[in-house]
Amino acid sequence: METEVHEAAGAAGHAGQAVGMPQLNFDYWPNQIFWLLVTLVAIYFLLTRVALPRIGAVLAERRGTITNDLAAAEELKQKAVLAEKAYNEALAKARAEAQAIVAETRAAIQAELDEATAKADAEISAKSAESEARIAEIRAGALQSVSEVAKDTAEALVAALGGKSDAAAVDAAVAARMKG
C-alpha cells in the first residue's frame, strides 16, 4: 500500500505542475526571459549586421541613381536649351537668306519686266509712228483721189447741164470746197 501512496503522491505532484499554461508558470519565467533575451540579441545582430546594411546600401544606391539621373536631366536640359537656341538662330539666318533671295529674284524679274516693257513700248511706238505715216499717206492719197473724183464729177455735171466746163474754174471750186 505504501507504493500506492507514493504513486498517488507523485501523481499529485505532477498534477500540480500540469495545471494551466506552462508559459504562465512562474517556475519557468527566468528560463523564458533568458531565451527571449538571446532571441532578441540574435535578431538585433542579424538586423544590424546583415539586413540593415543591405537596406542602407540599396537606399544609398537609389539616392545615387536619383542624383545622377537629376544631374543627367539637368545636363540634357542645358543641351536642349543650347540646341533650341542654335536652331532658332539657324532658322532666323535661313529666313534672312530666303528673304534676300526673294528680294534679289524680285529685282531681277522686275528688271526683266521693265526691259521687256521698254522693248514692247519701243516696238509699239515704232509701229504707231509707221501706222500714223501710212495713215497720213492714205489720207493724202484719199484727198487727192477725192479731189480728182470731185473734179471729174463737177465737169460731168457741167457738161450734163449743157455748159462748157472750164478746167481752171472747176479746179478752183473743188479746192475751195475741200478746204472747208
Swiss-Prot record:
The chain crosses the membrane at residues 33-53. It is a single-pass membrane protein. It holds the Pfam family ATP-synt_B. GO terms for molecular function: proton-transporting ATP synthase activity, rotational mechanism; proton-transporting ATPase activity, rotational mechanism. GO terms for cellular component: plasma membrane; proton-transporting ATP synthase complex. Disulfide bonds: none annotated. It is found in: Cell inner membrane. Belongs to the ATPase B chain family. F-type ATPases have 2 components, F(1) - the catalytic core - and F(0) - the membrane proton channel. F(1) has five subunits: alpha(3), beta(3), gamma(1), delta(1), epsilon(1). F(0) has three main subunits: a(1), b(2) and c(10-14). The alpha and beta chains form an alternating ring which encloses part of the gamma chain. F(1) is attached to F(0) by a central stalk formed by the gamma and epsilon chains, while a peripheral stalk is formed by the delta and b chains. HAMAP family: ATP_synth_b_bprime (MF_01398). This is ATP synthase subunit b 2. It comes from Cereibacter sphaeroides (strain ATCC 17023 / DSM 158 / JCM 6121 / CCUG 31486 / LMG 2827 / NBRC 12203 / NCIMB 8253 / ATH 2.4.1.).
